[in-house]
Amino acid sequence: MNQSEMMAKIERGDGFIAALDQSGGSTPKALKGYGIEEGAWSNDEEMFDLIHQMRSRIITSPCFANGKVLGAILFERTMDGTVDGKPTPQALIDRGIVPFIKIDKGLEDDDNGVQLMKPIPGLDELLERAKSLGVFGTKERSVINAANASGIAVCVAQQFQLARQVLAAGLVPIVEPEVNIRSADRAESDDLLLTSILEELDEMPDGQRVMLKLSIPAEPGKFQPLIDHPKVLRVVALSGGFSREEACRELARNPGMIASFSRALLSDLRAQQSDSEFDSTLGQAIDEIYSASTAKVLA
């Protein structure tokens, strides 16, 4: 796939984006969920080798390349690794899957109801390396814990400032200001977030487009103005702590929004499964998430 083919697939394709981007802090939890306890490694290198083996197993599973997975978000070390003897982004492209990379370095402590992104040292070099490896876009996450208008405005402004840097590097940013689905004022946060994003989009030059990765809104259809916006390439949903069943049910009530799930995609996979068991389990998850992304129901 060339750049224009990847753009068309992400903009119009039926399917969803797999999030395979657990980073250093969340890797032990991801491995434990996969059936590998902390005693199985003695240093970070061994830990990252284990998580790369898991991701390689996912990427090389026949069902992962069945056309239902449009793209995959990678952790930096996964991007720099190999799958089937090829750089991971190329292995994805060979399977018809568009590669993205997570670029944020974690979250600051809560302030004004939001957790901003920590500084990202060496970002220009990372973006240049990603571009050279065939990566299409980036993903960067911050979190909204309370319906604080000024906090949310600052959070979204930081996201779009970073998005401009990504666009300047020739990549497509996935802007991810996640609303905490457990917060008491989630619906109000959705409203404030929508307003702030629309204001930032209005400031963007014509011809530039971003993607948005958002929590599934408390009110179905709330983010339709973003889905329809000419400066938005695609709106994808995070699972945000929902089970796969819950996340799929909620997502199916939001036309135009597709999944970008991590835990809800991978939760039933185990290192101890045979290849046939692993492929069957992953295939079932892919089918369910694909259906919720493409076959919508009336709210």
Listing of model-derived features with the role each one plays in the protein:
Residues M1-F136, I144-A146, S196-L214, A218-A299:
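Alpha/beta catalytic barrel-like cores
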Residues T138-L212:
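Eukaryote-skewed repeat-based solenoidal scaffolds used as protein-protein interaction platforms
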